[in-house]
């Protein structure tokens, strides 16, 4: 008799995706982040659901409802901080997952990669709208500044912004719709993640060498299930250390002040995971130019398969490209630091140089390094 997991219509899907899936025998811990992102998403949906039970999306009560969650709801404080810091863990995993894809040439799986880029945009949109919900100073002014960027779009810009706001400023209508979108988007992300996985399983996983592993496959369970459980335990450990010992470490103190349209905070800045893009935005003196650079800083990922000039897929055996990759990582860390600094000398020029370096590395230096390595192979 055949095992039920191989015959049952529903269990068959689970079996082919998580149990009997043929996986390369040599994938490293950098391949753990997909499952960790899945865990982050489930955690965010669950904590978010319980927060939504007590939250009110009205400008007069939003701030106090969050205070009520933290003070009066049973374990409300831990749910709130797990949700806020869970977002940070989500983005740490996201950046490492994308970085892994860049390093090992996983972007040659075109559909998987492009769905992944859409997932990144959707997650960033969700996180931005979630940051607005507590209705603190940084929530209000962050929403005002970022939505205002759309006014840079020629001809329709101003109308578009007022349409998104639901009025002539960020107000009750804006908060209510942001809550609605913040609630629905994670489910859209879940659906996209399933599509992401569907496309991945059409080709099978990449591996550190970038060479086909069809001749050397092992079942996903128990080898990678146990490996993923270890990763999950480390993720939860890191999250709980953050939640229980330093819950406000990554937040902004300004968000503990209720939103006040008459008082602008001295430094308006987004959460840490958007700072690199924010630094690129600020480094261009022109509004439309800044907005385009901001969008392109992420959208440039779509071009990665076109910019791949190397004869090898992975960077494992390409020392010059490795060097370029780690310079790019250092550049992104520099941009993240600059994004959190005030707009004054020397931060302005550092930000501008780091922004130029970012696009130069991806569009020119990395493809050039690959071409040089191709020629060195002939020697």
Swiss-Prot record:
Heme b b562 binds at residues 83, 182. The keyword Metal-binding applies. InterPro entries: Cyt_b/b6_C, Cyt_b/b6_C_sf, Cyt_b/b6_N, Cytb/b6-like_sf, Cytochrome_b, Cytochrome_b_C_euk/bac, Cytochrome_b_N_euk/bac, Di-haem_cyt_TM. The chain crosses the membrane at residues 33-53, 77-98, 113-133, 178-198, 226-246, 288-308, 320-340, 347-367. It comes from the Eukaryota. It is found in: Mitochondrion inner membrane. Component of the ubiquinol-cytochrome c reductase complex (complex III or cytochrome b-c1 complex) that is part of the mitochondrial respiratory chain. The b-c1 complex mediates electron transfer from ubiquinol to cytochrome c. Contributes to the generation of a proton gradient across the mitochondrial membrane that is then used for ATP synthesis. This is Cytochrome b.
